[in-house]
Amino acid sequence: MSNNWFSSTAHRPLTTAMIGFAAAYALHAIDHFRRGMAASPPSIMVGGTIQGIVVLIAVVLVLRHHPRAPEAAIAVGFGSAALFVYAHVLPTFLPDFQDSFTSGPRINVTWFSWVTAVAEIGAGLLLGYVGLRARRRRTTRSPERVTSRA
């Protein structure tokens, strides 16, 4: 199951961060269903669906210890955090592409909406950071890496 790009023990933080992020994503999706499908613009719903597919691919890569798992974690983690800040935290300046919790119309936004959005942003940042560390660890332990001294 493992391509042995680094030990299973070293891979554990990436797996844990990915599962945590996937859980935060799922809770946020539940909040969208709770708020009602009409609460968000169609572009947000389409974007969330595309994000769900990308998250699923990243989960599979991480759980299979694929060599590109750290890069997937970096892209999904930091990308999701940035998109969530834009879509839910910033004031509305492109209403067709935002579901802002800070400016109108805020349809059915509750404390649970805020908790799930902040959890996904935080989990995304953590996933991206853990992905960076995993990639750095893989690069420094790579047997192909040759250093020459001049």
Task: Show the residue positions of the predicted features.
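Cytosolic juxtamembrane helix and N-cap/initiation of the first transmembrane helix
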Residues: M1-A22, Y129-R138
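Alpha-helical transmembrane segments of multi-pass integral membrane proteins
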Residues: L14-L27, G79-L83, A119-A123
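Short, highly charged, low-complexity non-transmembrane loops/tails of multi-pass membrane proteins
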Residues: T139-A150
